[in-house]
């Protein structure tokens, strides 16, 4: 029986070659197969093309590597996102790659934001084009991300469309099928286990007016056992309670049995901090020690069930602090995931590192670490007790990127971060991010994928390749403009690092507003998207300028103007900008306010 991914790889090659002028390559004799040498290799010569890989998914990655080698550039997902080279001679199609092994084994993206089925499928199709090999569907079902789009949260100008359970299950199934077709590794769940253990759906950060039926299973916080801020997924359990732990473990085993199509199952605790249990028994240990014991229970239960499920565990918030006594009994089942959600993106990871003193942990009075050095010291402490498989789980395109109006600063930070991973014994990187983080360009995503695939590609090479394909002969004009915007931007300010009153930054935002307002835009499709970005930048930088000067009323008025503009353009810019997410981050982190109902 023919493997669907190998067949897809051959079809992909033919489809792309058919786009070339003169139809060169349409009659190629194409062969695909599996081999043990590296991740993939290929040879295209004299009308014959041979692609081999260690897995069918790696064969597809080899096909895209070849297409990039002959001049294709995959700028962003969906229609119009592929640059087709102008090749005029058959020999232009000849290329060879000896057995190649990717620089990092884990190269993935985690779903965030508000997502339609079409945009999600386009994104999954785009992932292997730039070297990614994994996609993470958060929660037991990724309902929350689809609901945000179809209900048009934060955009009252579009009619909401409620989805049934059957429809949501269908969306999840189509996404999983698209991943399987391309040989993309499937990661699932993460948060939500605590909600499931209490009898509530683990499908998002949904609020409830109901109280937990068995309150004794819920963490005791501020003298009460109740849902944290009304959200079951953000609520910790009383992990000293054997019944609470058993319920959580049973949910993990049930899900593992019912979901055979995944490659990695993430087992995390609640998605908030300073809300762990303060009962007498829980205070005898640390939440990290309790977490390790829960993971050991999960391993034992999966072993008894005969399930080889790979479990990903999380270093995040309270769990950044290494356990004092507990240790994993079967470390081979586990993969460590380091998630420094509170770090700055104004500074990249260093390639050499000396641990620093970390702030002592105080139960439910923790301040999240912002410096790169303190976050990395937590990782260093965990690595003293776990030396197995691991990857970084980071957030450059989750919140901070909205503060970089040119996307060039965040792209370079990404590049430098990835080139530092091996200094921390990491096997890769997964970005928790909006799928539509493409405004003004998809360059940060492009840099991320190709750097993880092949760390030898220079940043300058990627920059020239991407921008010349995106903007044509005047690409340097676009690059210079975006570089200047980035030089004046602050990812930290938008991400709520530091005081809101910043007259020094206000000057920068004034310059950004002037630059974007005066930029002369040539004709062309991608240039038209840059025209939208200029107006976007004028409005948002104006709101930020007022906020930095302490003019809250004016800042909110300007922010409402910005929201009205992007809402009115949402369908036209759907592939590039997540309107829900930029508004959500601006309200919950940056400091803007919208009137209720807007």
What annotation goes with each model-predicted range?
Residues 63-67, 447-448, 466-467:
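Short amphipathic C-terminal alpha-helix that caps PH/PH-like domains
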Residues 33-36, 48, 56, 82, ...:
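Aromatic-lined carbohydrate-binding surfaces of glycoside hydrolases
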Residues 23-24, 258-262, 304-309, 520-526, ...:
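Surface-exposed helix-capping loop/turn segments at secondary-structure junctions
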Residues 1-103:
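Contiguous, structured surface segment used for ligand recognition
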Residues 425, 450-598:
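Catalytic domains of carbohydrate-active enzymes that cleave complex glycans
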